Amino acid sequence: MKYLLPILILNVFSFAGEVDQYLAWNQLPNDESHYLNKLFNEEIQAALDEINKNHNDCSCEEAAGRILKHFGIGLNTPLEKQLKSSTQLDKYPPNEIHISERYKKSIFRRELPFKNLEQYQDYSLEIYIDEVVNVGGIYIGLDKLTHFTASGFLYYKIYRLALEFVESKEAAMQMAIAMGIYGEKYILGKISSGVFSYADLESNFQGFLFALDLCNSGSTRLKRSGKGWELSGSFDLRDYVNPFWDESYNPSYYYENQNLSLMPKSQAV
């Protein structure tokens, strides 16, 4: 257990963003599965190139962990930053909408008496609210992609450590899930944003399953070749994204306190 605490503490520095799925209602961004899959497969190949260069003798399980870790385990991974600034990705709200208009209908917004406070609120929401994208007809926040890779890695790390002192894979999996729930409830959710996101937990878990699939029976599996580790198939994000990633289908719990940079939650929630 002493090995698991530092991993949980690491979560404090991992995520703070939230998503307002309702902003994207009636907007219907285009399906970006192909674009996202291309980026993911490029990053996975880059991770494999690094593994085969510096860790060629590692186990399949270690390689799977290194692939997820390659995406980053901190706040706003490089891939998420790239997607947030991309003009090629259809997302909502788009960059073209002025910040003063972008979050006027957000569930996190409230009426304030002074214009300078309104401007502060605009920038606060700009920092904390992530855009919504369409993956195979399912609308998700960009933050879920970081949860998939970064928290998926943390779940997988906890799982592998837990296997050293629990009796079964099922018990190790339950320990990883329990630590994830604890982090979402007390650190990432209530303390940082006032939101407990069930959709975050689902994307965390699916990232963990991806890591397991890489060395088991997933459609994208690792295999040994003369060059080292390689994929037997292409990664497809749609194999893991499901409606429970959508916070309008799988609503969050909103604590009755301050959230999103000291802004009280809206009465609309």
Positions of predicted regions on the chain:
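Sec-dependent N-terminal signal peptides
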Residues: 3-12
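Intrinsically disordered, low-complexity, mixed-charge
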Residues: 15-178, 188-201, 205-269
